[in-house]
UniProtKB/Swiss-Prot annotation:
Record localization: Plastid, Chloroplast thylakoid membrane
Purpose: May play a role in photosystem I and II biogenesis.
Tree of life domain: Eukaryota
Family: Belongs to the PsbN family.
Any one annotated GO CC term: chloroplast thylakoid membrane
Main location group: plastid
Protein name: Protein PsbN
Originating organism: Stigeoclonium helveticum (Green alga)
Length: 44
């Protein structure tokens, strides 16, 4: 457990997990109401 690579790996794993969770929250949670949809803005 004194290996710095172990702590770096844990930190990197939690960092990537938090970025993924935040992007899912923004994409599907309450902030998604403010996102614009370019397909709805485009008129045929």
């Amino acid at each position: 457990m004194d290996n710095p690579a172990f702590f770096f790996t844990i930190f990197l794993w939690f960092f990537l997990l938090s970025i993924t969770a935040y992007s899912i929250y923004v994409g599907f949670g309450p902030p998604s109401k403010r996102l614009r949809d370019p397909f709805e803005e485009h008129e045929d």
